[in-house]
Amino acid sequence: EESVRGSGNVHVTQPSVVSITQSCETGTVYQLQEIRDIAKIAHEHAMSVHMDGARFANALVSLDVSPAEMTWKSGVDVLTLGGTKNGCLAAEAIIFFKPEMVGDFPFLHKRSGQLLSKMRFISSQMNAYVSDDVWIKNAKHANTMAKILSEGLNHFSNIELAYPTESKEVFVHLPRDVID
């Protein structure tokens, strides 16, 4: 909440969006209540909540919740649904949970160079990705493999996990002699 302290001061950049990554770059996952708490504070300060869902499916599997529970039911306004880190080739989708927020987005999308010629060939992957729960199966497999790796690494006294393994990423602290 302290991050919005400069709000209303003309000499300070005005915050307008809180962006969270689910799951995080460290492989940890925001719990639903944490998302709700962040969204509540953001909305109290007239800010939107964006979820970077580059590893969205991995977080869903980790929490064993529905997409709705982790997004709009928890206060998320916009989701960037990533497929690239879970089996797609450069495919992402932006989902606005409040239609009034779309505004000039199609024009900004084009102007920013993110609307490529023949984009439909990239976008078509998303249909296959969500069909037959491919995205969930891929995420379950990746999360399971990360857990197996974590458990195996825990058998080494000189290797320490940097973060709990809650999704598909494993980070470790290695002793200098192992690194060298």
Region annotations inferred by a language model:
Residues 1-163, 167-180:
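Conserved PLP-enzyme active-site core in the AAT-like
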